[in-house]
Regions:
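Charged, glycine-rich intrinsically disordered N-terminal tails and low-complexity linkers that flank
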Residues: 1-67
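Mg2+/Mn2+-dependent nuclease catalytic core
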Residues: 55, 60-63, 67-137
Length: 137
C-alpha cells in the first residue's frame, strides 16, 4: 500500500519522513561502487542510528529548479488539461526502507495514479536538446 506523506518538500517534516530511507534520487548511487556509495550508506546509517538529519547539497541549478517548479506544474496543467496534486514523499509497504519524492501526482480518467517529475534544464542544456532534436529520457 502506498502512503503519501504530505509535508512540503524541503520542510523539517519531509526531511524527518525521509530519514534512513533509500530514495529514488539516490538509488543510482546505492547501486554504484566506490566512495560515493560508501558515503551514502554511512549517511543512511547515521540517520537510522542517531536521527542525524542531512539536508544535503543544493546547487544554484537545483535551487532554480525548485523555484520554477510551481510555474512548471501550472504550465503542465495548462498544456495537458490534467490536474496535478502536490505531494511530499511516497512510501510503499511492499518496499520497506524506500521512498520517492514526486513533484506531483496525476489521477487518470481510468482511476490510476501517475507520478510527475519536473525538470527545469538550464538554457544551454535545453538548446542542446533542441539542436539534437531529442527529448531527454
Amino acid at each position: 500500500m502506498i502512503t503519501w506523506h504530505d509535508a512540503p518538500q524541503g520542510s523539517d517534516e519531509w526531511l524527518d519522513a525521509r530519514m534512513g530511507l533509500l530514495t529514488a534520487s539516490n538509488f543510482k548511487t546505492a547501486l554504484s561502487k566506490g566512495s560515493t556509495r560508501d558515503t551514502l550508506m554511512r549517511k543512511m546509517a547515521a540517520e537510522i542510528a542517531w536521527g542525524a538529519k542531512d539536508e544535503g547539497y543544493k546547487s544554484a541549478a537545483m535551487q532554480r529548479g525548485n523555484d520554477l517548479e510551481a510555474e512548471a506544474r501550472k504550465s503542465f496543467t495548462a498544456d495537458t488539461g490534467l490536474s496535478v496534486a502536490e505531494v511530499g514523499l511516497a512510501t510503499n509497504s511492499k518496499l520497506p526502507g524506500m521512498g520517492a519524492s514526486l513533484d506531483g501526482i496525476i489521477g487518470s480518467p481510468a482511476g490510476s495514479t501517475v507520478g510527475l517529475e519536473i525538470k527545469c534544464p538550464l538554457a544551454g542544456t535545453l538548446a542542446g536538446y533542441h539542436y539534437d532534436g531529442r527529448i531527454p529520457s
